A protein has these predicted regions:
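Nucleotide-sugar donor phosphate/pyrophosphate-binding loop at the beta->alpha transition
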Residues: 65-66, 106-107, 115-136, 174, ...
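Conserved donor-binding/catalytic core segment of Leloir-type glycosyltransferases
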Residues: 5, 144, 187-208, 213-217, ...
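A charged, aromatic-enriched C-terminal amphipathic alpha-helix characteristic of glycosyltransferases
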Residues: 325-332, 340-374
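Nucleotide-sugar-dependent
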Residues: 208, 255-293, 303-312
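Nucleotide-activated donor-binding/catalytic signature segment of Leloir-type glycosyltransferases, i.e.
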Residues: 230, 237-266
Length: 381
């Protein structure tokens, strides 16, 4: 059995948890070497590398060095691994430092799920961080990205020819218990609810998205209800609960377990917001969020801003709403249309139900193939 040392930025993060499950489901053994943003009890064997704070960049840099020392102190566990899998640039640096401290030559895979704002800066800071990424990327066995937008707009721009890339989208894991898909067609006998329920699910980290949804709640106090599922990034949305408390048709449900809670969440929604502007103009334009796959599996259509990789994905599959700027005026127009006529929602529900399941669910053995080919085994199919 192939053994993986997984260097993760937050042991409690839902995406980290999903990746571990996908490895284990594909027959790979995982030992975590992970930092944490909050206390948690991981489902896997884990070496705690210390606590970090969201947005505290200097503290995270210091923790990279401390974490590497802690990882190297568990040299026997680290040496048992056939492969190191490092998520995000800070953990990639931590992994290479740990290798140096422990005097190991274990191959490394770099997973980049976001292109951090520092990496796109044009000044000396940006050039320095890109130099670090380039040097570590060249020493990595492979690169894993969740969106082709990251390859086109970042890695090919700065590091063309210096890496071997795999696209691993943020799909549901094949072995996870996320329940059955809805019935094949939107059932005509079901009585349509009086309100359009619009959800925002996952990392709630975008002030503009929050403002747009609150504005929709104000514009349609009796016709629209906004549901928020997940944890807010306090550094990005400093005033959160007071805005929710001021609106009777905005409901915050807090954190959730993925995939266990997904079926109930998406069953309660008519549409899901899939926009992000936290890093507008670069990362937010290039990413493909979890919610388009989760919502797609449960036949809940997404709404995305035009000109983004998410919008292109929805248009390619013909399964969601794309809204042009200015969103402050165009998004309310769409919602007003859906309030008065739900047929477009029904049409996209039926399209989503008709799409192949593997658009939303990662096939069994997919991550095993990525690992095998990275280590020089058979070609992936």
């Amino acid at each position: 059995m192939t053994r993986i040392a997984f260097f993760g930025h937050d042991a409690a993060d839902a995406a980290v948890r999903r990746r571990v499950k996908s490895f284990v489901g594909d027959g790979l053994e995982v030992t975590g070497f992970m930092m944490r943003r909050r206390d948690s009890d991981p489902d896997w064997e884990n070496v705690d590398l210390g606590k970090t704070r969201d947005g505290a960049f200097l503290q995270r840099i210091a923790q990279v060095f401390k974490g590497a020392r802690k990882a190297a102190a568990h040299r026997e566990k680290l040496a048992d691994a056939d492969l190191i899998y490092a998520r995000n640039l800070d953990m990639l640096a931590c992994a290479f430092l740990a290798k140096r401290y422990a005097k190991l030559d274990t191959p490394v895979i770099y997973e980049s799920l976001d292109v951090h704002r520092l990496l796109v800066r044009k000044d000396i800071v940006g050039r320095t961080v890109r130099f670090l990424e380039r040097s570590l990327l060249k020493r990595s066995r492979a690169l894993v990205v969740s969106s082709p937008g990251f390859i086109k707009n970042h890695f090919e721009r700065y590091y063309a020819g210096q890496y071997k890339a795999y696209l691993v989208e943020n799909r549901l894991s094949a072995d996870a218990d996320f329940g059955p898909r809805p019935c094949g067609d939107a059932c005509s006998e079901t009585v349509a609810p009086k309100k359009v329920i619009l959800g925002w699910v996952g990392n709630l980290r975008c002030q503009r998205s929050f403002n747009l949804l609150c504005a929709l709640a104000d514009a349609f106090p009796h016709a629209v209800e906004v549901h928020l599922h997940g944890l807010p990034a306090r550094t990005e949305i400093p005033v959160f609960e007071p805005e929710i408390d001021a609106r009777q048709n905005v409901r915050y449900f807090g954190s959730y377990q993925s995939p266990e809670d997904l079926s109930g969440i998406y069953a309660s929604l008519d549409v899901v917001w899939a926009g992000d502007f936290m890093e507008a103009g670069y990362n937010s334009v290039w990413l493909l969020p979890n919610r388009i796959y989760e919502g797609g599996y449960y036949a809940t259509p997404s709404i995305a801003p035009a000109g983004t990789e998410t919008a292109a994905w929805l248009q390619r599959h013909g399964c969601g709403f794309v809204v042009e700027e200015p969103l402050e005026t165009e998004l309310p127009k769409l919602i007003e249309k859906l309030v008065s006529d739900r047929s477009e929602i029904t049409r996209y529900v039926n399209v989503l139900n008709a799409l192949p399941e593997d658009i939303f669910v990662q096939p069994a053995g997919f991550m095993r193939d990525v690992v095998r080919t990275s280590l020089g085994g058979e070609s992936a199919t």
